[in-house]
């Protein structure tokens, strides 16, 4: 397996784990108000299981929905829920540049998560697309500002993640162009989820090396 194939496989594995933090983390947070110890134990168990078996959380959720005969567009629902902050990804450094990075990432995710509500209104959706483009630019500008001000030993990892984010941003743009031809909204939802995931990975990478 080539290095590029290994990176692709790793990205796919982490992408399939999105339901853990988008769906289950809010559940754990609610449970903490009732039983802190049980919530922490359950969270740790899910994290461990998901790490060892990427996609397990999604499989569990899908099985529950199937058993309850609940029909839901899981990809769309995931997109709606994926805007929330994830503590494990948020950068804790107090410097303004890092907090600005948190804020810009949050803004982009929130706009992307609104796509299901906007996509059927062409005028509103076109405005949303403009807002997404602006949010992407602002996030990249903030990433570059951090690069300029701070030196990192593991700069290569940061550069790689930035390139991945740009790649998925372009892919999202291409998906939008196709959508206006074929009208398949599900592909837009999938691409938006991937872009949200890459946004989280930017935060995670900075948090790891900062």
UniProtKB/Swiss-Prot annotation:
GO terms for biological process: angiogenesis; cellular response to anoxia; cellular response to leukemia inhibitory factor; establishment of Golgi localization; Golgi reassembly; intracellular signal transduction; intrinsic apoptotic signaling pathway in response to hydrogen peroxide; negative regulation of apoptotic process. It comes from the Eukaryota. It is a peripheral membrane protein. The modification N6-acetyllysine is found at residue 177. Coiled coil: none annotated. It is found in: Cytoplasm; Golgi apparatus membrane; Cell membrane. InterPro entries: PDC10_dimerisation_sf, PDCD10, PDCD10_N. There is a cross-link at residue 184 (Glycyl lysine isopeptide (Lys-Gly) (interchain with G-Cter in SUMO2)). Keywords: Acetylation, Angiogenesis, Apoptosis, Cell membrane, Cytoplasm, Golgi apparatus, Isopeptide bond, Membrane, Ubl conjugation. Its main location: cytoplasm. GO terms for cellular component: cell periphery; cytoplasm; cytosol; FAR/SIN/STRIPAK complex; Golgi apparatus; Golgi membrane; plasma membrane. The keyword Ribonucleoprotein does not apply. PANTHER family: PROGRAMMED CELL DEATH PROTEIN 10, TF-1 CELL APOPTOSIS RELATED PROTEIN-15. Belongs to the PDCD10 family. Homodimer. Interacts (via C-terminus) with CCM2. Interacts (via C-terminus) with PXN. Interacts (via N-terminus) with STK25. Interacts (via N-terminus) with STK26. Interacts (via N-terminus) with STK24. Interacts with GOLGA2. Identified in a complex with KRIT1 and CCM2. Interacts with KDR/VEGFR2. Interaction with KDR/VEGFR2 is enhanced by stimulation with VEGFA. Interacts with RIPOR1 (via C-terminus); this interaction is required for the association of RIPOR1 with either STK24 and STK26 kinases and occurs in a Rho-independent manner. Promotes cell proliferation. Modulates apoptotic pathways. Increases mitogen-activated protein kinase activity and STK26 activity. Important for cell migration, and for normal structure and assembly of the Golgi complex. Part of the striatin-interacting phosphatase and kinase (STRIPAK) complexes. STRIPAK complexes have critical roles in protein (de)phosphorylation and are regulators of multiple signaling pathways including Hippo, MAPK, nuclear receptor and cytoskeleton remodeling. This is Programmed cell death protein 10. It comes from Rattus norvegicus. The lineage of its organism: Eukaryota, Metazoa, Chordata, Craniata, Vertebrata. The gene is Pdcd10.
């Amino acid at each position: 397996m080539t290095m590029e194939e290994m990176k692709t496989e790793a990205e796919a594995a982490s992408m399939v784990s999105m339901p853990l933090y988008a769906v289950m983390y809010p559940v754990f947070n609610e449970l903490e108000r009732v039983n802190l110890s049980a919530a922490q134990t359950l969270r740790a168990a899910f994290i461990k299981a998901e790490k060892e078996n990427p996609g397990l959380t999604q499989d569990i959720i899908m099985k529950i929905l199937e058993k309850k005969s609940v029909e839901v567009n899981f990809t769309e629902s995931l997109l709606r829920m994926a805007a929330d902050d994830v503590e494990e990804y948020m950068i804790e450094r107090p410097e303004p540049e890092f907090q600005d990075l948190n804020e810009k990432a949050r803004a982009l995710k929130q706009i992307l998560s609104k796509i299901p509500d906007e996509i059927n209104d062409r005028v509103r959706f076109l405005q949303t697309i403009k807002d997404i483009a602006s949010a992407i630019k602002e996030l990249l500008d903030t990433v570059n500002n951090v690069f300029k001000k701070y030196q990192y030993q593991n700069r290569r990892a940061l550069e790689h993640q930035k390139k991945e984010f740009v790649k998925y941003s372009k892919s999202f743009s291409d998906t939008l162009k196709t959508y206006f031809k074929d009208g398949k909204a599900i592909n837009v939802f999938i691409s938006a989820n991937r872009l949200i995931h890459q946004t989280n990975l930017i935060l995670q990478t900075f948090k790891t090396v900062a």
